[in-house]
Regions:
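Non-ligating segments of multi-cofactor redox enzymes
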Residues: 1-257, 263-299
Length: 299
């Protein structure tokens, strides 16, 4: 693949921040609701957004997929969540964790926090914590809502209710600021989740995307598809000089040369931007994501 074509992948990576901002705006398009202290409840809420974004955010244009999934499995008339499961499979098989890197509002929030100029710490020696998000997915998103039910057979959305910091950031805080009744109803659970939010904020300043790496069940779901998704990262080993700049640049602690489509890769493109030989690029369905007379060039 020539240099002209390689630059397309690099440009996508370079404009990632803008793409994240636009995705966050589209996910929360009803901005006037912040001043009204109300939640948008139109037809858009019947559709899930790809990233982690609280249903209760006043500006939210769609439903959170994790919240929607818990609502189904926790229902007193539980049936297999065909729509939500199909949604996960469709996006996972198509994009994998590209969604985490480019389309998730809470991922962008962590990226912005990490830009605050302070000493940064590596998570290289904390890789074991990666598996925590899978435990949270199975226990708090699936098992608890399904098995721990009330007298009429309804289960709580345990992850949203007891763990998710996005709910406090986007939902509880803005709604309480505009509604005295909500402020008066805030209690110990709000305090507990606020502590989680503050902890994630502090950790995000010091470490790169700790919530994505260790806690997020949505990232856990998308990670299952990273190795088979239509969008992938390709390393041209015949061009590689073994400088390891790509692996050093990866803040998700992925060895790019060995496993470019590792479950932890959020496809941010940092490895592409530092490669001196332009040997790393995006592919879609086995074809280069690049220009060649306005067509996709075959691998």
């Amino acid at each position: 693949m020539d240099k002209k074509n390689t630059m397309i992948s690099k440009k996508i990576a370079q404009f990632r921040g803008w793409i994240q901002g636009i995705a966050t705006l589209l996910t929360n398009i009803h901005l006037p609701n912040f001043f009204k202290g109300k939640i948008y409840q139109g037809n858009g809420k019947k559709i899930c957004v790809p990233g982690l974004n609280c249903y209760s955010c006043p500006a939210a244009s769609g439903a959170c997929p994790i919240g929607a999934f818990q609502a189904v499995v926790g229902s007193s008339h539980f049936k297999f969540a065909y729509y939500i499961t199909g949604f996960f499979i469709l996006l996972g098989v198509t994009l994998g964790r590209f969604i985490c890197g480019f389309l998730c509002p809470f991922g962008w929030f962590q990226d912005l926090l990490h830009k605050i100029p302070t000493k940064k710490f590596s998570t290289e020696k904390l890789k074991a914590l990666r598996y925590l998000k899978y435990v949270i997915l199975v226990v708090f998103v699936i098992l608890f809502p399904m098995l721990m039910t009330n007298a009429i057979g309804m289960g709580d959305p345990f992850f949203c209710k007891y763990i998710c910091p996005q709910g406090v950031l986007e939902g509880a805080i803005p709604l309480s600021l505009g509604n005295a009744a909500i402020r008066s109803a805030l209690g110990k659970l709000f305090t507990f989740k606020s502590v989680i939010l503050v902890s994630v904020i502090v950790l995000s300043i010091l470490f790169y995307r700790p919530f994505c790496k260790w806690i997020c069940p949505l990232g856990a779901i998308y990670s299952l598809f990273n190795k088979v998704s239509l969008l992938s990262i390709q390393v041209e080993h015949d061009k590689c000089v073994g400088c390891q700049q790509c692996t050093k640049a990866c803040k998700m602690d992925v060895n790019v040369l060995k496993t470019p489509n590792h479950p932890e890769c959020i496809r941010c493109g940092a490895c592409m931007k530092v490669c001196p030989k332009n040997a790393i690029h995006y592919q879609f369905m086995g074809k280069d994501v690049s220009k060649d007379k306005n067509k996709l060039k075959e691998k």
